[in-house]
Each structure stands twice: as structure tokens, then as C-alpha cells.
Amino acid sequence: MIRVIMLLVLVWMTPMISWATEVVKDVSGQKVEVNADQLKRGKRLFNTHCSACHVGGITKTNPNIGLDLESLSLATPARNNLDALVDYMKNPTTYDGSESIAQIHPSIASSDIFPKMRDLSEDDLYAIASHILTQAQIQAEKWGGGKIYY
């Protein structure tokens, strides 16, 4: 009887699970809902294009600066919202915002040097940014926290 009830609950919840959304913010602080398909796409793209250096939200080249919300919010300009992260993926700058690092960080601006970036559309960049911000919310300090968590 319990198995039947559990099965019925699972069947009943399946449509709700597929419509699940996460909430991230845009540059004005407005909440933006991101659906499960967008998050799945963002995760796939992140794993393909970003995880060589940012697995688990860390930054292998500078472990002091991760993709956690605190680090993103302390950057200049702040990178803790969708639009700012997309802007960074197009034209990356140093953490203090003073210099372009497009020649050493994969970006749309340097797609001639980093061919993996050539095929990314604006929607792809937003999907990746959604994945990063969602992971930062869900995993909290584990996302970008470095090897103390892995």
C-alpha cells in the first residue's frame, strides 16, 4: 500500500518537477525565473566551456576568488547578477575592473584565441550565468569554496 501511495505521489509531482524554477537577479535587482531546461543547458555549457578552470565554482588560477556570491559581489563592477556575468563572459576584466584580461581569459572578445567561445550565443551566455548564480545559491559556501569542501 505504501509503495502504491509513493508511486502515485511521484506520478503526481512529475509535472511540477519538470516545471521547477530557480530565481536569480538581473542587473537592476529584479528577480528572474530560470526553468529547469535552461539550468540543464547552462550546466552542460559550463561543463564544456568553463569547468576546466572553474570546476565546483573555484578559480584554479586564483583560488582566492571563486564564483561564490560573495566574491562575485565584491568584484568591480559587481558580477553577482545575470547581466554582469554575461558582460564578463563577453569582455573579462581584472577583479578590480581596471584592465581587460580578454587575452588570458576565454571570452567572446577573444574567440580568435579561445575557439570554444566562438559558438556561444547570447542565450548560451545567459544559461551559463544562470547556472553559476543558481549553484552559488544552492551550494552556498561549497560553490567556489575550494578544496576544503572536496
Curated annotation (Swiss-Prot):
- Key words of the record: Chloroplast, Electron transport, Heme, Iron, Membrane, Metal-binding, Photosynthesis, Photosystem II, Plastid, Signal, Thylakoid, Transport
> What is the residue range of the signal peptide feature?
1-20
The source's domain of life comes to Eukaryota
Q: What is this protein called?
A: Photosystem II extrinsic protein V
What are its GO cellular component terms?
chloroplast thylakoid membrane; photosystem II
HAMAP family for this protein? PSII_Cyt550
Gene Ontology molecular-function annotations: electron transfer activity; heme binding; iron ion binding
**What gene is this protein a product of?**
psbV
